Every structure is written in C-alpha cells, then in structure tokens.
UniProtKB/Swiss-Prot annotation:
This is T-complex protein 1 subunit eta. The lineage of its organism: Eukaryota, Metazoa, Chordata, Craniata, Vertebrata. The keyword Chaperone applies. InterPro entries: Chap_CCT_eta (IPR012720), Chaperone_TCP-1 (IPR017998), Chaperonin_TCP-1_CS (IPR002194), Cpn60/GroEL/TCP-1 (IPR002423), GroEL-like_apical_dom_sf (IPR027409), GROEL-like_equatorial_sf (IPR027413), TCP-1-like_intermed_sf (IPR027410), TCP-1_chaperonin (IPR053374). Its EC number is 3.6.1.-.
Length: 543
C-alpha cells in the first residue's frame, strides 16, 4: 500500500532543488554580468536606463546600473549586493567585482553539472582567494607618506585611473587634481560628507571650481533682501531652526474679543513676539543668520536695516556642514544665543555662478571642508559627473589610508592568474582543477578590456601570458596602442585595497551561490496579488 504523502508546504509553493536549480542560479548571475560587461574600462560604453517614472539616467558605473535594474531573481540579487558593497567600501571596481563573480561561477559550472560536491569547490575558492590576496600584498608597491610630492603624484594617478573609464575621461587630469585637492583639504578623519558637490547648469566642464569652505545655493528670499550686505570679514554666524515669520494660526484657534482695543492688543502681541526674537538675534552679535525654517519679509527688512545677512529654508545637510565647519550649534530657540553657540569664518560672501547665486563661507576654523561646484550641460551628464567624482574621491581616500598600489589595466589579474596556475600544478586531486578554473576566471578582466576596445582579445592575452611568464608582472592591456605595455610605468595605478576587496567579495558571492542547494518560493498571498494600483492615501483595502 502506498504511504500517504505528507504535505508540508502551502499549495502553490515553488520549490526546486538539486543540480538543475544550482545551474539555473549560475545562469541568472551570467545575465546580470551581461548587463554591465560592456561598461568596463576606458573604452567601456554607457547605459541609458529609464525608470518606472520616466526618469532617464546615463551611467557607466556598475553599481548605479545594477541599482536601477529591478532584479527579482534571488540569486542574481547577490551580485547586485556585492556591487553595492564595493561601491560603499572602496567606490570603484563595481563592474569588475560583478564580472569576476559571474566568471568564477561560469568556470565551475561544468564541475557542478558533473556532480562535484559544492563544498569542495568552496574550499578550493577560499584557498585561491587567500593565496591571491597574499600575493597582492606581497607585490604591491608602497609610496612613502613622508614625501608629500610623491604621495600627491600617486593620488593623482589613482584618481586618473578611476576617472579614465567615465564620461569625463577627456578632462581626467583636471578633475583628478581637483579631487586630490579636495581630499587633501579634509582633516585626518577624511569624512566624505565634508566634501559637498553642487551642480550648476551651463558653462563648460573646465569652469567647475573647488571652494575651500562651505558653499550652497542662495535660498528663496523676500523683499528687502537686496539691501543686505553681500560680503563680511570675520562674521559671527547664527544657525537656527526657528521660524521668523508672521503666520496664520496653525490650529483652529478661536479668540473672543469685545472691543477693537482687545483685537489690537492681540495683533501687537504677535508683532512683539516676532520683534523680540529679532532683537535677541541682533544683540547676540551675529552678522549672518541661517535658518532651516522660513525667514519672512519683516525679518528680512529688519536685518537689512541693521547690516545683517539672512537666509531661510537652508537645506538641513548644508546647515549641518556649515555647523561642522564654522563651529557653533543649531539653536531651536533664540533665548540662549551667546557667543559660544555662534559659528565663525574668515570671509562670507555671495557671488554669481552661471545663472545662480551662491553663498560661500571660507576660512572655516573648526573642520576642514570644501565644496566642488560642477558646471556642464545636460542634467543627466552632470549627475554622471557627480557619480564619477564620488568614485574618484573614494579611491583617493583609500589610497591615503592604505598607501600601497598595483598596476591596473588587467596587469594584476594576469599576474595572479599566472601565480595560481603555477601553484595549482603543485597540488594533487580536484583542487588542482578548481584553482586552475579560478586562475582562468581572473583573465576575464583583461579579456573584457580588449573586447570593449574592439581589440583581438585572444592575441593580446597570449602576449600577456608570455610576458608574465618571463617575469613582466606589471604588463597589462594598453588601450592606446592596441598592444601590451608596462602599466606601472604608464601610471595606470589602483590602490591595492580595491583589488583585494573585489576578489574577496566576488569569491564570497560565488561560494554563497554554489552553496545553495534548494530554492523555495512561497506563493504570494491572494490579497497582495490583486492590483494595488488603485490604493492611495485614504483608500484602504476592502474588508
């Protein structure tokens, strides 16, 4: 008699296990890699992505592209996550890390199909990654921090390598210098949020400028603003979160008055409350008043009469950066405005940049800060420029903290590939095949660089293998001559951290996907499955 089957999972649950689902997961990761494959390197193409709301984004950055893709496959999401983590940790190498993870999986796919146990693959990969990381640390070149000129040269080269694959690669020398200047202005903590990037449409890219201090766009202002001075030396700055404006009652207030005098007394009281606040600000000695909330026309004219400058509705992040740079603290009341809570800077001025007016605070005593003002044409182009600069800034920060570099352009990957191939020949058994597969997967980076530039990849890789076998460990792809070259001599440098991070993240992701032996998808509940488009605010579900 047949035993009764035990039904454990809900009806409609999709469960797949064994080798077929593992192969399916590997194939899904290949599809993700295909999406960013062509963006790698200085001859990489850009992607134009339009989201559900019709907003267009042009980008070459692997992490940005993967964020904008609406990936639903659970295994493929892992690759999106490692690209995001690489972006957050080191800023560059996001496309490389996705390609490496997908290529590791591609190389082990035949072994998986033949039934090799996933744990053997994982063990081999962990060994290979450890060997590769140790090799990078061993051959990386360290630049002495004491020699400031040399260190600066190193940082500029690293920034130029990061920018060479971006839309602004034509101006990479100009922006590399700007990025290094910006990071050098910061204090030892190198806080990323102390570098502000503001975009002003119009003008050429070369008109972009670096301001040693805080700069933000002039806020909306009321009549009387034009009377205020636009430049101060050594002013005191009041940072407020206070509304300086006469407004209608927020709540449904009800006041019963019997005579005109009663009504007048209420009106006078409202004015007196406002004037009382303004007087306290004036007596505090502040010359520049910034508030997160609106500053109305009465207050604007009051300050103008007393040679004071004010700006209301200042964005919170700009107010916080001003506070961190100039000192002082943001006050929610004007009753305790003493010199301790006021900020200071050497010069405050308002200047015209393109069609916009900007407020500048320079010579800030508390924290070193700076602002990059970008100029350019189309909005999408400027957004991509901002993303490119973010990557370059992250790379320069990493290079300052870890001052060892390796050659880019596929050189370090070819050297690691040769090293692991030689190592694999010294060990017996299945590990030999798997470490050999890992070594072959590393060649995807130089191969893809060649493919994206339209070169004959097989020919160039053969030349590279031969040169690395003869001991030319820094030889990589030379995009300009369609040949190979010593990329260390050509100053194609990257911080060693970028490569170490990319290898470990890609290897871990590959191991994670190989170790999954069953995928169970719960059915979507019937309520969720119904079209939710009609539900907005106040239109709940029908019960």
């Amino acid at each position: 008699m047949m035993p009764t089957p035990v039904i454990l999972l809900k009806e409609g649950t999709d469960s797949s296990q064994g080798i077929p689902q593992l192969v399916s997961n590997i194939s899904a990761c290949q599809v993700i890699a295909e999406a960013v494959r062509t963006t790698l390197g200085p001859r990489g193409m850009d992607k134009l992505i339009v989201d559900g709301r019709g907003k267009a984004t042009i980008s070459n950055d692997g992490a940005t592209i993967l964020k904008l893709l609406d990936v639903v496959h659970p295994a493929a999401k892992t690759l999106v996550d490692i690209a995001k983590s690489q972006d957050a940790e080191v800023g560059d190498g996001t496309t490389s890390v996705t390609l490496l993870a997908a290529e590791f999986l591609k190389q082990v796919k035949p072994y998986v199909e033949e039934g090799l146990h996933p744990q053997i693959i994982i063990r081999a990969f962990r060994t290979a990654t450890q060997l590769a990381v140790n090799k990078i640390k061993e051959i990386a070149v360290t630049v002495k921090k004491e020699d400031k000129v040399e260190q600066r040269k190193l940082l500029e080269k690293c920034a130029m390598t990061a920018l060479s694959s971006k839309l602004i690669s034509q101006q990479k020398a100009f922006f590399a210098k700007m990025v290094v200047d910006a990071v050098m202005m910061l204090d030892d903590l190198l806080q990323l949020k102390m570098i502000g990037i503001k975009k002003v449409q119009g003008g050429a890219l070369e008109e972009s400028q670096l301001v040693a201090g805080v700069a933000f766009k002039k806020t909306f202002s009321y009549a009387g603003f034009e009377m205020q001075p636009k430049k101060y030396h050594n002013p005191m700055i009041a940072l407020l979160n206070v509304e300086l404006e006469l407004k209608a009652e927020k709540d449904n207030a009800e006041i019963r008055v019997h005579t005109v005098e009663d009504y007048q007394a209420i009106v006078d009281a409202e004015w007196n409350i406002l004037y009382d606040k303004l007087e306290k600000i004036h007596h505090s000695g502040a010359k520049v008043v910034l508030s997160k909330l609106p500053i109305g026309d009465v207050a604007t004219q009051y300050f103008a009469d007393r040679d004071m400058f004010c700006a209301g509705r200042v964005p919170e992040e700009d107010l916080k950066r001003t506070m961190m740079a100039c000192g002082g603290s943001i006050q929610t009341s004007v009753n305790a405005l003493s010199s301790d809570v006021l900020g200071r800077c050497q010069v405050f001025e308002e200047t015209q940049i393109g069609g916009e007016r900007y407020n500048f605070f320079t010579g800030c005593p508390k924290a070193k800060t700076c602002t990059i003002i970008l100029r350019g044409g189309a909005e999408q182009f400027m957004e991509e420029t901002e993303r490119s600069l973010h990557d370059a800034i992250m790379i320069v920060r990493r290079a300052i903290k870890n001052d060892s570099v390796v050659a880019g352009g596929g050189a370090i990957e070819m050297e690691l590939s040769k090293y692991l191939r030689d190592y694999s020949r010294t060990i017996p058994g299945k590990q030999q095949l798997l470490i050999g597969a890992y070594a072959k997967a590393l060649e995807i980076i130089p191969r893809q660089l060649c493919d994206n530039a339209g070169f004959d990849a097989t020919n160039i890789l053969n030349k590279l293998r031969a040169r690395h076998a003869q001991g030319g460990m820094w030889y990589g792809v030379d995009i300009n001559t369609e040949d190979i070259a010593d990329n260390f001599e050509a100053f194609v440098w990257e911080p060693a951290m970028v490569r170490i991070n990319a290898l470990t993240a890609a290897s871990e992701a590959a191991c994670l996907i190989v170790s999954v032996d069953e995928t169970i998808k719960n059915p979507r509940s019937t309520v969720d499955a119904s079209p939710a488009a009609g539900r907005g605010r106040g239109r709940g579900r029908l019960h």
